[in-house]
């Protein structure tokens, strides 16, 4: 029995890693109604805003930001936890990006299960580095080629006032998702993504939900918090959390821009 459980644990960690690296965005277990960043009510959409306009503005703003982003460094903490909050494994370190396609990660501390770090955390980090270099390419960008958007209103998300849209994938693909996106009305940047994979990933994955949250640092929008919630058949529920902190962008130390709710539209 111990041997079977050991093999199942290994298999589960591999499946969780597959989920995270396949989807490219990650998840958190809290429901929207319990999320303090979504305490504000959904407001009616202002007149004159169309899905086509939002897509066009997102593309142009993203192109400008990508061209201006030369480098960044961030301190990251990866954790695998259970629903009681017990940390089963943790890995912390410094992620460095250099335009156009180089990422490196330097580990500064490790805690908990070495097996989980080896089977889940290390492959996750390696996959991100390979994706940045172009060794793994899957077009999962939020563009008209991959998604239809249906604007449903506006909402304050923490510091940022956003358009809210349902994102509907145009094909059944494990690299795409179905859910909601929150788009900053001034910068046309993604503030929050929440949903689930467009394609069932495995017989073993009974449920998979995700959220990614971003923050504005200077003129750029970079990840703030990820969590992945996965319910695995015969094994239960696990959460992988990633915190992104202490950014240095283009040689400048972390300065989170406080944004008012006034729109530019």
Where in the sequence are the language-model features?
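N-terminal secretory signal peptides that target proteins for export/translocation
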Residues: 1-8
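Intrinsically disordered, low-complexity proline-rich regions
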Residues: 7, 13, 51-53
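Bacterial N-terminal signal peptides
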Residues: 11-22
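Beta-strand-dense domains in secreted/periplasmic systems and polymorphic toxin scaffolds
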Residues: 193, 224-226
């Amino acid at each position: 029995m111990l041997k079977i459980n050991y093999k199942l644990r290994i298999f589960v960690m591999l499946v969780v890693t597959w989920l995270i690296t396949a989807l490219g965005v990650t998840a958190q277990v809290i429901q929207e109604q319990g999320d303090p960043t979504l305490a504000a009510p959904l407001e009616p959409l202002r007149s004159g805003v169309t899905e086509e306009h939002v897509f066009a503005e997102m593309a142009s703003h993203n192109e400008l930001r990508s061209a201006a982003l030369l480098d960044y460094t961030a301190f990251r903490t990866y954790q695998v936890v259970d629903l009681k909050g017990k940390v089963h494994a943790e890995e912390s370190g410094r992620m460095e990006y250099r335009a156009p396609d180089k990422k490196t990660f330097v580990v500064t501390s490790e805690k908990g299960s070495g097996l989980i770090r080896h089977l889940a955390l290390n492959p996750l980090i390696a996959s991100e580095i390979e994706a940045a270099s172009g060794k793994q390419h899957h077009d999962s960008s939020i563009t008209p080629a991959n998604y239809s958007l249906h604007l449903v209103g506006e909402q304050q998300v923490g510091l940022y006032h956003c358009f809210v849209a349902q994102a509907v994938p145009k094909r059944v693909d494990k690299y795409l998702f179905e859910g909601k996106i929150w788009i900053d009305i001034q910068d046309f940047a993604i503030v929050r993504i929440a949903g689930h994979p467009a394609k069932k990933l495995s017989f073993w994955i009974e449920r998979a939900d995700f959220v990614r949250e971003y923050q504005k640092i200077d003129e750029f929008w970079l990840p703030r918090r990820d969590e992945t919630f996965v319910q695995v058949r015969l094994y239960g529920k696990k959460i992988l959390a990633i915190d992104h902190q202490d950014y240095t962008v283009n040689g400048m130390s972390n300065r989170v821009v406080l944004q008012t709710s006034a729109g530019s539209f």
